[in-house]
Amino acid sequence: MSNSLDRYVIHGGRPLHGEIEISGAKNAAVAIIPAALMVDGVCRIENMPQISDVDMLLKILQGLGARVEYLSPSAVEIDCTQVRFTEPPYDLMRKIRASYYFIGSMLGRFASAKTTMPGGCNFGVRPIDQHIKGMTAMGANVEVKNGFVYADTPDGRLHGAKVYLDKVSVGATMNIIIAATLARGRTVIENAAREPHIVDLANFLNSMGADIRGAGTDSIRIQGVERLHGGTYGVIPDQIEAGTYMTACAAAGGEVRLANVIPRHLECISAKLREMGVTVVEGGDSVLVRSNGRLRHTNVKTQPYPGFPTDMQPQISVALCLADGTSVVTEGVYDNRYKYIQELSRMGADAQVDGCTAIINGVEGLHGAEVRACDLRAGAAVVIAGLCAAGETVVTDIRFIERGYENFVGKLRSIGADIVLERDGAEQCAAAAAE
């Protein structure tokens, strides 16, 4: 895991060529790990991304008393049978937003939970009111006080309920699914989010004995079961990691094949890149991306799946900074997700932000500068900008990037990028295994 002094040093202007294998989905893994707390047996999870968020969640499980063993770099065995109710480790919980999934899993298993308010990326206001609404509907008493979430169920077990989400929320949908899995009776979530990682969470739980139907639609039905048994499950490929490399190729130029993907999960990204003049060819489990010269301008609005993902907004905005003409980007999911625009301006981008909208006037080229990763996806965006820029770009605060991208430097170097990781001033190639 990186510290605050680590940085990426990039020399841009090199087109990208080659193949990258996409890792397991971060947004699925960070919900599956807390859900494993409810499994009465040993579960083996494969295709687990090697990222710091996963490391922290596994350490939280260990802090609760679980046995966690890596069988390979991407396969982990989890045994929570000996876990007894306790408070999760504060120093880890506060660092990661996905820690809120322990509210659902602890209520499901112990009928009680005490967790910290989640940390993670520092953009926007992302309250957990819809999570609380779902837990309350299922019979929990929930109180948020002094940065902690306290929850308990007076009846000793959650009960089924009909929950209508006031807004489409991925986190709330997943947390309610987790909590409802061991609840008494039937729970229905209306206006549910439909993202691929929600389907993956449901498939994981079903493989362990849950009864969840409708995941991937806006109406999800969960019939509570008495227990979950152990088993083996493989995490789906990461839609956002794939989209990031697709956009990097589009912006920097070249031709890159992405292996181990589910092309239908990428359709919203592929369609937008095609609008910009990029060739995207879909295979059975691969996508080929080919740049065809300067990009065309277009407009982008982020929406819940199957719309254009908010987690791809910063990356596509970098590409639009180099397109011909003016593009309009509208953030329809989170507020205050444009902190990275100031960093791009330091590199010569011409973009202005007005509320939830960014007006981007394409320029001929960017120049290197020292910039910071404001959050996970903003960090990926400034790296892409560095790959396109003339001269040297230095990216600081890279700990945000390592939260969600496995072997980011190594994968980029494998397709021709000139990027190195410097730890405390000492240059590290960090890609030796890929070269």
Question: What label would you give each PLM region?
Answer:
Residues 1-435:
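Short, structured segments at the rim of ligand-binding sites
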